[in-house]
From Swiss-Prot:
Heme c binds at residues 14, 17-18, 63. InterPro entries: Cyt_c-like_dom, Cyt_c-like_dom_sf, Cyt_C_IC, Cytochrome_c_Oxidase_Subunit. Homodimer. Binds 1 heme c group covalently per subunit. It comes from the Bacteria. Keywords: Electron transport, Heme, Iron, Metal-binding, Transport. One of its GO terms (molecular function) is iron ion binding. This is Cytochrome c-554(548). It holds the Pfam family Cytochrom_C.
Amino acid sequence: AGDAAAGEDKIGTCVACHGTDGQGLAPIYPNLTGQSATYLESSIKAYRDGQRKGGNAALMTPMAQGLSDEDIADIAAYYSSQE
């Protein structure tokens, strides 16, 4: 399981589209607030590893490529803890 407090320090790239609270800033950006950390983690890893294509993959893959497994777990824990 990730560390939500550590995740808050790692969301710098995410906030441009998803905001600090996980509410998508435009209709094409999904809300992350309260989503399952497991779901968020697997989704971000799939983008990073090139397994998820179509939709927002062209935007998300480059954003996720620099993230370690620990970074992803922490970010997922942070956004899933938001209300």
